[in-house]
A protein has these predicted regions:
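Sec-dependent N-terminal signal peptides
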Residues: 4-14
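Short, charged/polar, low-complexity loop and linker segments
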Residues: 30-32
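Cleaved targeting-peptide boundary
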Residues: 17-26
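Compact alpha-helical subdomains of small soluble proteins
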Residues: 76-147
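Stable alpha-helical elements in mature extracytoplasmic
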Residues: 24, 43-50, 133-136
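Short N-proximal segments of mature Sec-exported proteins
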Residues: 36-92
Length: 147
């Protein structure tokens, strides 16, 4: 009986440990595969994710490349502004309400990138390579270059 209880306990611990190591977010590509890109909510989320990933990239390179770090922050803020505009148009929100919600959303997403970037660093000594973060940055770069 003790062995069965021990096996059950170990099973739950190993399952929980795998959940802890899993990424916080799914990639933007996976997200968009399940959503309608024409939907305003999807577009707002995409703009927020891209703003967050550019903010994250800016923070990572700040000490080694301040010029590009500043460019990334400018891009992130531009994407954030577009998200605010879309919320006002799509959801008929007031400017201040839209701004607060978008900033809170970006902060949460930014923290998720930080957490997943740290996990990726522990795994392969890169904040980007070998993770969905690199893929997200590539997708967002295409979005920024289209505009």
């Amino acid at each position: 009986m003790k062995k069965i209880n021990l096996l059950i306990f170990l099973f739950f611990i190993s399952t929980y440990a795998n959940d802890i190591k899993a990424d916080t977010e799914t990639s933007i590509k996976e997200y968009l595969n399940k959503k309608n890109i024409e939907d305003g909510a999807t577009q707002i989320y995409l703009l927020n994710r891209c703003s967050a990933v550019y903010t994250y990239a800016s923070a990572i390179i700040l000490k080694i490349d301040t010029e590009n770090s500043k460019k990334f922050i400018d891009i992130a803020n531009n994407l954030l502004f577009k998200s605010i505009e879309l919320r006002i148009i799509d959801r008929k929100e007031k400017l201040e309400d839209a701004r607060k919600k978008v900033e809170a959303d970006r902060e949460k997403l930014f923290q998720n990138y930080i957490n997943d970037g740290k996990k990726n660093w522990d795994k392969n000594k890169s904040y980007f390579k070998g993770s969905y973060i690199s893929e997200d940055l590539s997708i967002c770069e295409k979005l920024v270059n289209e505009k």
